[in-house]
């Protein structure tokens, strides 16, 4: 029975990436609406922008948690992950092949901090430009997590 994104298979805890995949799908849906003719109406565009930013924030938080969870699975002393800084976690994830570019995740963190502390339309528009690449990077992360946590037949 799943417990907080984990389930057992043999003696090893396996990550269940469903919540991250669903968050990513919500982000992609929001971005799709933002690119649609519906967004030609400024009021509707504002709502789609807000939905996209919110989906980004949620997906970002989950992506980082899943990086940490996977590293805990890989390290001989899982508690070491809790002592790592953000950049140590992201660099370790890159070294493990979970993400392709640690510096991009640092930029996503900065974008997340901007969106969580104040709402500024111009800043939100700048962040929107980065969201398709963010979605691609999270898709890569999910694929790597699913590869590592596939239950053997």
Q: What are the residue ranges of the model-derived segments?
A:
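Solvent-exposed interaction patches of small proteins and small membrane subunits
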Residues: 2-153
């Amino acid at each position: 029975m799943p417990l907080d994104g984990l389930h057992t298979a043999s003696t090893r805890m396996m990550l269940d990436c469903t919540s991250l995949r669903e968050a990513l799908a919500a982000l992609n849906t929001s971005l799709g609406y933002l690119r649609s003719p519906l967004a030609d109406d400024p009021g509707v565009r504002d709502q789609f922008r807000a939905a996209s930013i919110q989906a980004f924030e949620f997906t970002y938080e989950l992506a980082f948690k899943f990086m940490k969870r996977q590293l805990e699975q890989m390290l001989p002393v899982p508690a070491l992950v809790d002592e790592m800084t953000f950049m140590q976690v992201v660099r370790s994830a890159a070294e493990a092949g979970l993400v392709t570019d640690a510096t991009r995740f640092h930029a996503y963190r900065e974008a997340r901090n901007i969106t969580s502390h104040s709402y500024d339309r111009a800043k939100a528009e700048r962040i929107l430009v980065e969201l398709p690449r963010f979605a691609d990077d999270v898709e890569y992360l999910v694929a790597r997590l699913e590869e590592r946590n596939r239950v053997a037949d």
